[in-house]
Swiss-Prot record:
Any one annotated GO CC term: mitochondrial matrix
Cofactor note: Binds 1 zinc ion.
Biological source species: Pongo abelii
Transit peptide location: 1-35
Family label: Belongs to the peptidase M3 family.
GO biological process assignments: peptide metabolic process; protein processing involved in protein targeting to mitochondrion
Name of the protein this chain belongs to: Mitochondrial intermediate peptidase
Subcellular location, record wording: Mitochondrion matrix
Complex and partners: Monomer.
Gene responsible for this protein: MIPEP
Cofactor: Zn(2+)
Regulation: Activity is divalent cation-dependent. It is stimulated by manganese, magnesium or calcium ions and reversibly inhibited by zinc, cobalt and iron.
Amino acid sequence: MLCVGRLGGLGARAAALPPRRAGRGILEAGIRARRVSTSWSPVGAAFNVKPQGSRLDLFGERRGLFGVPELSAPEGFHAAQEKALRKAELLVGRACSTPPGPQTVLIFDELSDSLCRVADLADFVKIAHPEPAFREAAEEACRSIGTMVEKLNTNVDLYQSLRKLLADKKLVDSLDPETRRVAELFMFDFEISGIHLDKEKRKRAVDLNVKILDLSSTFLMGANFPNKIEKHLLPEHIRRNFTSAGDHIIIDGLHAESPDDLVREAAYKIFLYPNAGQLKCLEELLSSRDLLAKLVGYSTFSHRALQGTIAKNPETVMQFLEKLSDKLSERTLKDFEMIRGMKMKLNPQNSEVMPWDPPYYSGVIRAERYNIEPSLYCPFFSLGACMEGLNILLNRLLGISLYAEQPAKGEVWSEDVRKLAVVHESEGLLGYIYCDFFQRADKPHQDCHFTIRGGRLKEDGDYQLPVVVLMLNLPRSSRSSPTLLTPGMMENLFHEMGHAMHSMLGRTRYQHVTGTRCPTDFAEVPSILMEYFANDYRVVNQFARHYQTGQPLPKNMVSRLCESKKVCAAADMQLQVFYATLDQIYHGKHPLRNSTTDILKETQEKFYGLPYVPDTAWQLRFSHLVGYGAKYYSYLMSRAVASMVWKECFLQDPFNRAAGERYRREMLAHGGGREPMLMVEGMLQKCPSVDDFVSALVSDLDLDFETFLMDSE
């Protein structure tokens, strides 16, 4: 029943409606277009100046976080959750007493919305607010709402009210496709909790769900926990690369970018050394997921997890991964040969390529072959220029403008958070984006998109505007310069804005399927598509200007940057295929035919090609097994779809308004309210096959010979 509001970095970065003109149906249902506000200012300037104290309205009335009156103090979370729980009780009563029909689905959605509005907001505040009191209060609210959701998902009367609707064929046939899909999604949530089982099995399902939550939390903590080794066991000259603690050296990561081969090797072997407790936790997590899936009627956890996705089932996922691996194998071998050549050049004594080598040596090759030192690019990518670039692109593609709006006192959690109003040229205000872009103490390091409030059509005909947060970790401005982004930071900004536009334009009738609340292998398509725009010179040329001289970024610098990303890209993609395959096997048929480490060894040798290192257990650090269990392939599949959309719709003209409107209408407007493959078909005007997806990914690896011609001129 509860939506998860966060979309973070998956993969290399580490979230049915009848066809209609996007946004029109809802507007015609009675929404009044909002006029442009006089308090809005141009977006570029807002990000290249430091916020003044006055912009936070120091003497005005305190509004509360995100304008929620109760949240002007940490204690307000208790009031907000109590209010939501009271409303939930009333709505449960209404749902159980209302005759089955479309109204049943509306009540369920309002129930979901009343809980999500507190839970999603709290989910963000508990990790992002600088004040511990706010974080703790938000954590408690998450727990309280989570308990309520567990109760609702096992409420037999509530389940029966929905089952009566879906069991009546005549009633179901009378529902519009979006309403029917939302009803089925709510039913899916119920059945995952085992509500359709007898009392004893239902209790077992609830117990397994609780156990899985606890094991997931324990596994995540263990995945990031450092390992230590006695000092005398490490060569003296590499000890200074690690943290000391008495007689021990602490290893807290892989040190993948270290130029010293021995440092990388030591970090790899020590950080990935098996921990018996973590191993037991993973085994229990996988077997508990399998037991739960079987209990509620699925042959494997993977079959359960892939319901409603583009792939639909594990067989399709494995076909996709195996075909992709076959197509990559020759290119991957060439990449490893290139890495071996560079390693031999720098370290003639030991040129064998090991798993700790590719990230470092591919970076060396990139730097040698293309002059792409980030400091050459940063002056052209001031944050204000990049935001203006996004504004230009969104305006030309979708008729959307971003305006900076002054937040009220207490509305934001840090004075450097900017608030953007998202405004359509004819439809008016679509929603708000809060930009939490800058580094600060205790802030999570991952770039993320959070849904704070989902959009939905309210009973009075007005539309509940979506509210999201984009969280990045950019350096602050200095006395002499505004915030300057590396090319990677600029691409991440475009990526996260892709999620935000999905939230703004996925204007569904129901909150349960609004914006990014869609299957995982579709959710990354809008964000990855934005990366293609960020790497196109015609787009970059609109905004990349030197912050001091105003000079545009030369075309050959953009081309070199794009081509440099293809260095060892096949090996990088092959690594993702290995991870995704391992994830599928772990969540496939149980009992597993071997230990998780033996399966890792087999899979690494078959799907990656570099040797397994004895006495290591990389799977115990694979934290994505928790959030993306059986769905790690999603990033690759989303990239394949985004690549096809780019090539077929935007490659000829990245500012094509007709293609932009079609993209909104076919892919963004439905949120999760339509089957993802139907949205892909609508956009591409064909039903892509697994071979099409594989070809799209592989063709992206081909070098663009225009770059070499330009550089040789």
